[in-house]
């Protein structure tokens, strides 16, 4: 991970946990990061253009209502319920100690920004509009997903204890893949036909200790390529069957973390252990990142022993390629373009603060130059007029694709919050 450099660091007044880091993605493509400490403090990280032409990080505390004194934040999550404007929901779960009775737990849902008055994202306004729901259990992860059809409730029975982490993915709006891990080490995946509301397959395995995270992914780092004639078909990368397959990475607090390959077709039969992941205390988090910018994702895991470990898939196995030491235990990871420069940053939440790590800009420039040379080798460079025609053609094609996608999604395709307990 030598090509990932520390750019900024922000101290927290108190520690967070594995659930207190989330991204906010606006409809214009701008990303922001919302994170919190346990002691009622929530912060927003964003980047602003400065007069000197440089991007400046800005951290501001957001004062959310209905978080009483003495309460602690357990988890948070954010999603946009609209595809054409910034109409966000922010969910925060809290626990309030009560010496006379059982601890009180709540799910606070913040929304109702007046888009007619102020169509731009205003976190401060959203933070003042709260629906507080009294819970009769202690929540863990807060997660949002989509309901594609009104009565789609087919899932295998889960007679286990507390969920630690939950992840859902969809294939072509007709198949739902669900993975979850529990405090007891139980880990389960299921594949559901959402059209017929039937369970196609379900698989279970057991880990020693708690499962700290499950994450579904493809090997290929997908990018929507523009349909420009200046890029010939021979340069367009065609995804292989292995790259299209859905895999799941499972991190464990006591034993080797593992990746199960092609779970839709193979279930949990193809297991690749992440060798060395059990040597650095408990693994608390993971994320998927194209660290070397080769178009394929690598797995980064964070440990309580303050280590970042990066694994790459080569020769049908996941190999430890590099590691990096930080000063405090690592609790959560995000890989998101928060600076708006087209390159994603690695966001690392530790016990003491938030790291923003960036790709080495010199290496990025060299990589871009080499790829442009490969693309335009022995090919005619486009004229300005041709570029304009191609841009208009691409925009028309995107409009047609958007209309097609909207037609394939039913009227019940709205995100909802899901809490793990």
Enumerate the predicted regions with their spans.
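Beta-propeller-forming repeat regions
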Residues: 1-421
